[in-house]
A protein has these predicted regions:
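Alpha/beta catalytic cores of nucleotide-metabolism and tRNA/nucleoside-modifying enzymes
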Residues: 3-43, 123-124, 185, 195, ...
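Bateman/CBS regulatory modules and CBS-like beta-alpha motifs in cytosolic regions of diverse proteins
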Residues: 51-63, 70-72, 101-141, 146-148, ...
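Short beta-strand/loop segments at the ligand-binding rim of alpha/beta enzyme cores
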Residues: 62-67, 116-120, 236-244, 286-301, ...
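Glycine-rich beta-to-alpha transition loops that act as phosphate-gripper elements at the mouths
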Residues: 71-76, 123-127, 184-188, 208, ...
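Catalytic cores of alpha/beta
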Residues: 80-81, 254-259, 301-319, 363-377
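Glycine-rich phosphate-binding active-site loops on the catalytic face of alpha/beta enzymes
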Residues: 89-101, 264-276, 318-333, 362-395
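Terminal amphipathic helices with adjacent charged low-complexity linkers/tails
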Residues: 95-109, 153-166, 197, 207-224, ...
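Active-site-adjacent beta->alpha loops and helix N-cap segments on the catalytic face
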Residues: 99-107, 215, 220-232, 251-253, ...
Length: 505
């Protein structure tokens, strides 16, 4: 047995000891959630616009804003993940799809923009215009380099070349640009590439070696995106970062390998109960087989759960048992922990070894401030992003207002489509759901939502006198509030006549 798996067995065995306790001692403590507390304002020299929202998702992946989109099939596919990364956060592709499709979603994110596309999509000289058009449509690109069998660049075909062609069965060699083809040598910087693109009024610059073999592609779109989104979350090659969800079954190791080959930056073993034998063994197995992949595991709600995962070498721990707006785990099973206490306990259990992700329970931007002040380094949200343009699904009209659908991965419909294993129910003919399907108001572009959330976070940091999230975690203090205090916190004794973009009940 591999060392990591032996360690998992030791952790499991040690936690089985000492379970018995008197009935009167089984109410362990009081637990709190976001609405139960407020942060105490303090002396501040910090202006909100000067705050720094840099944080870590895992030990090896950083973000410029501490926001993650959840791996839910009504929240995150490639379109959402692309925009989350551009804004400086990170999106996690859900796993309610075949592994090949999930890998393709990851690939779309990695190819969406780049400092230099390292392995550009190409076609051979005998390919048809129909094939070229299909490839451009599939990957949302405007041109394709044409290469010989040995990889030597011979031309490029763009959508302008296809614009007035009626015979799509022609080979690309008859239409492609081959004479006076502008190229750049290996080692060309983006600044140099920008000058060449501008000088020749072209949109794509192939990068070739001394033998004429295609080694990369620089596009004007990527240069524009770099200016438009200067704080984008990117890897060392200038590509947008993306995460993806896997389960804890034996088949998910192969899924993890395929996603790693597709270029995924972070994998999350996404289960309802991360402090279970099956998940601990899966973490140990994944750590042995894919030691270089950034691995998140969850969900947990206790210090013991977080400590067990940290001991097995995960790169981050995801916290939340039942706080989500579309989750019914706590009322169906009677099990869970209010989110603020869960985060604090998990932070204590992690003991600084790995970052903690607070997953769920966010209704307002103030909840994000509280989660980060409690010790989380990032906050994962689902319903908050579900009503945006980038979320999967179409908006619909109801009683004159626009909505989009959101469903928990524990809802009956989601479980029937593949997420039942998240709740350890993949073998039954009947399912016991732990989530619901609902609608949320349409919110427009996710960038608008992120702007409001980041603005609320910056203001909260200003009130607390924290210039960075690390300072917020170290210096913030809470007070408990009564139900009367909570009522006082919200608008009261008035009728709202104009809705604010960051306040909805």
């Amino acid at each position: 047995m591999a060392e990591a798996q032996r360690r998992a067995v030791r952790i499991i065995d040690s936690e089985r000891e000492g379970k018995s306790m008197p009935a009167s001692a089984r109410i362990v403590k009081e637990a709190l959630t976001f609405d139960d507390v407020l942060l105490v304002p303090g002396h501040s020299l910090v202006h909100p616009k000067d705050t720094d929202l840099w944080s870590r998702v895992t030990r090896g992946v950083e973000v410029r804003i501490p926001f993650l989109s959840a791996a839910m099939d009504t929240v995150t596919e490639s379109r959402m993940a692309i925009q989350m990364a551009r804004e400086g956060g990170l999106g996690f592709i859900h796993k309610n799809m075949p592994v090949g499709q999930q890998a393709e979603e990851v690939d779309r994110v990695k190819r969406s923009e780049s400092g230099m596309i390292m392995n550009p999509i190409t076609l051979g000289v005998s390919a048809s215009l129909r094939q070229a058009l299909a490839l451009m449509t599939r990957f949302s690109i405007s041109g394709v380099p044409i290469v010989e069998e040995d990889g030597c660049l011979v031309g490029i075909i763009t959508n302008r070349d296809l614009q007035f062609e009626t015979d799509l069965d022609l080979p690309v060699r008859d239409v492609m640009t081959s004479e006076k083809l502008v190229t750049a040598p290996v080692g060309t910087t983006l600044d140099d590439a920008e000058r060449v693109l501008h000088q020749h009024r072209i949109e794509k610059l192939p990068v070739v070696d001394e033998s004429g073999h295609l080694r990369g592609l620089i596009t004007v779109k990527d240069i524009f995106k770099r200016r438009q989104y200067p704080h984008a979350c990117k890897d060392e090659h200038g590509r947008l970062r993306v995460g993806a969800a896997i389960g804890a079954s034996g088949d998910d190791l192969e899924r993890a390998r395929v996603l790693a080959d597709a270029g995924v930056d972070v994998l999350v073993i996404d289960t309802a109960h991360g402090h279970s034998e099956g998940v601990l063994r899966a973490v140990a197995r994944m750590r042995e087989e894919l030691p270089n992949v950034q691995l998140v595991a969850g969900n947990v709600g206790t210090a013991n759960g977080a400590s067990a995962l940290a001991e097995l070498g995960v790169d981050a721990i995801k916290v939340g048992v039942g706080p989500g707006s579309i989750c019914t785990t706590r009322v169906v099973t009677g099990v869970g922990l209010p989110q603020l206490t869960a985060v604090m306990d998990a932070v204590d259990g992690a003991a600084g070894r790995v970052p903690v992700i607070s997953d769920g329970g966010v209704k307002f931007s103030g909840d994000i401030v509280k989660a980060l002040a409690a010790g989380a380094e990032t906050v994962m949200m689902g319903s908050m992003f579900a009503g945006t343009d980038e979320a999967p699904g179409e908006a619909f009209l109801l009683e004159g207002r626009r909505f989009k659908t959101v469903r928990g991965m524990g809802s009956l419909s989601a479980m029937e489509e593949g997420s039942a294993d998240r709740y350890f129910q993949d073998e039954g003919r009947k399912l016991v759901p732990e989530g619901i399907e609902a609608r949320v108001p349409y919110k427009g572009p996710v960038s608008d939502v992120i702007f409001q959330l980041a603005g609320g976070l910056r203001s909260g940091m200003g009130y607390c006198g924290a210039a960075t999230l690390e300072e917020l975690r170290e210096s913030a203090s809470f007070v408990r509030q009564t139900s009367a205090g909570l009522r006082e916190s919200h608008p009261h004794d008035v009728r709202i006549t104009r809705e604010a973009p960051n306040y909805h009940l």
